[in-house]
A protein has these predicted regions:
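A structural "domain/chain start" motif
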Residues: 2-6, 17-61
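Sec-dependent N-terminal signal peptides
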Residues: 7-13
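Sec/Tat-exported extracytoplasmic proteins
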Residues: 56, 60, 107-111, 131, ...
Length: 162
């Protein structure tokens, strides 16, 4: 009984300390200090723009069409995706690819003052390639690309929340 009590107190203490320093699980909680955002992008209707807009709305942030109506303006300056050979087999065939996705952004206040200067966020994944199973490996690459896009969006939202 004494051991259970000590474990309970220790768990409560660790939880209190973690919550007190602002730590939280990824994807939990909301962005409290942001109410409205405008997204400026050359490709307004590409997958990244749409996913960013959905994620902001899921965090109770209104995405407005006019930059003057927004509390913040996220400017997407550039977006790149690359797929490079990471390793080759003994028979000189691709056995692993490196996927990299980058997005260059700026965050501006409503008055146009830069809050986050031009910053490039990036993420990468590696995946094994099997030439005998090309379709499933392409599906895996597409899944990894969606995960990478979501990771970049989380990075943008965390910078917006900072």
């Amino acid at each position: 009984m004494k051991r259970f009590f000590c474990l309970a107190i220790t768990g409560l203490l660790v939880t209190t300390l973690a919550a007190g320093c602002g730590w939280r699980l990824r994807g939990t909680g909301s962005v409290d200090n942001v109410s409205s955002v405008h997204i400026s992008s050359q490709g307004r209707f590409n997958d990244f723009y749409e996913a960013l807009s959905r994620s902001l709305q899921a965090n109770d942030i209104t995405v407005v069409k006019n930059a003057t109506d927004a509390q913040y303006n996220i400017v997407i300056l550039d977006q790149k995706y690359s797929r490079k050979t990471a390793t080759v087999s003994v028979t000189v065939r691709v056995s692993e690819y490196q996927l990299t996705e980058e997005v260059t952004i700026m965050i501006l206040a409503a008055n146009g003052q830069p809050l986050l200067q031009r910053t490039t966020l990036s993420t990468e994944r590696f995946f094994d390639f099997d030439e005998n199973d090309v379709q499933s490996k392409e599906d895996e690459a597409n899944l990894l690309r969606r995960e990478m896009r979501n990771d970049l969006i989380r990075q943008i939202i965390s910078r917006l929340d900072a």
